[in-house]
C-alpha cells in the first residue's frame, strides 16, 4: 500500500507504516513515497 509520506530512505517509512498497519508492517521507499506491506 502506498501512503502519502515522502521519503528518501527506507527507514523513514517504518514508523508511519507501523503506525497505520501495526507492529509487523514494513516499508520501502519507492519514487519518493513510502510503500507499506503487512
UniProtKB/Swiss-Prot annotation:
Q: Where in the cell is it found?
A: Secreted
Query: Hey, which family's this protein in?
Result: Belongs to the short scorpion toxin superfamily. Potassium channel inhibitor family. Alpha-KTx 02 subfamily.
Swiss-Prot/TrEMBL site (Basic residue of the functional dyad) positions: 28
Superkingdom field: Eukaryota
Pfam families from the xrefs? Toxin_2
Classification via InterPro entries: Scorpion_toxin-like_sf, Scorpion_toxinS_K_inh
Tissue expression as described in the entry: Expressed by the venom gland.
Per the UniProt record, the site (Aromatic residue of the functional dyad) maps to 37
**Which UniProt keywords are given for this protein, alphabetically ordered?**
Disulfide bond, Ion channel impairing toxin, Neurotoxin, Potassium channel impairing toxin, Secreted, Toxin, Voltage-gated potassium channel impairing toxin
Q: Name one GO molecular function term.
A: ion channel inhibitor activity
Q: What does this protein do?
A: Inhibits human voltage-gated potassium (Kv) channels Kv1.2/KCNA2 and Kv1.3/KCNA3. Does not block human Kv1.1/KCNA1 at 100nM concentration.
Could you give the domain comment from the record?
Answer: Has the structural arrangement of an alpha-helix connected to a beta-sheet by disulfide bonds (CSalpha/beta).
The name under which this protein is listed is Potassium channel toxin alpha-KTx 2.21
Predominantly, its location class is secreted
Cystine links in this protein are 7-29, 13-34, 17-36
Q: Which GO terms describe its cellular component?
A: extracellular region
